[in-house]
């Protein structure tokens, strides 16, 4: 593992702390870099102008008894990976050939966006139980690496 991998993962963890998700285990951060330069960052939180679960004092998914990994559309939050990709689009920044550092393995929805965004390498720290996302990464030309496996 090189110092840049460490620095960018530390930054992803810092960005995760900005999350407005009510559930602390859902505080996720993402940093997209290319040539050792930060292109964008993202954390999971409500869309611009929408009151977050943290501000509401409750998690919509918990209130409705929605199981983790299901019905992801029933949530105020936009995922960290999605927010990082959206910021690049808003700013006109190409992600072609970039690396994404993310605190958690991307879900299948984020995986599809990452594959189409031009990002070529994803380094994640914590696992997430989404086998289909892993299958999609395996079929794509995007390299998925667990942070602890970096040497």
Describe each model-derived feature in a short phrase.
Residues 1-151:
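Zinc-dependent deaminase catalytic domain
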């Amino acid at each position: 593992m090189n110092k840049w991998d460490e620095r960018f993962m530390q930054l992803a963890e810092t960005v995760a702390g900005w999350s407005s998700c009510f559930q602390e285990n859902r505080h996720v951060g993402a940093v997209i870099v290319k040539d050792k330069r930060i292109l964008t960052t993202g954390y999971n939180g409500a869309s611009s102008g929408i009151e977050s679960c943290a501000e509401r004092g409750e998690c919509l998914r918990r209130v409705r008894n929605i199981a983790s990994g299901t019905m992801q559309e029933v949530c105020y939050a936009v995922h960290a990976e999605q927010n990082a990709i959206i910021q690049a689009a808003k700013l006109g920044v190409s992600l072609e050939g970039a690396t994404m550092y993310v605190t958690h393995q991307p879900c299948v929805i984020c995986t599809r966006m990452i594959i189409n965004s031009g990002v070529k390498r994803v380094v994640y720290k914590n696992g997430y139980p989404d086998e289909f996302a892993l299958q999609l990464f395996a079929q794509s030309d995007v390299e998925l690496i667990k942070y602890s496996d970096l040497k």
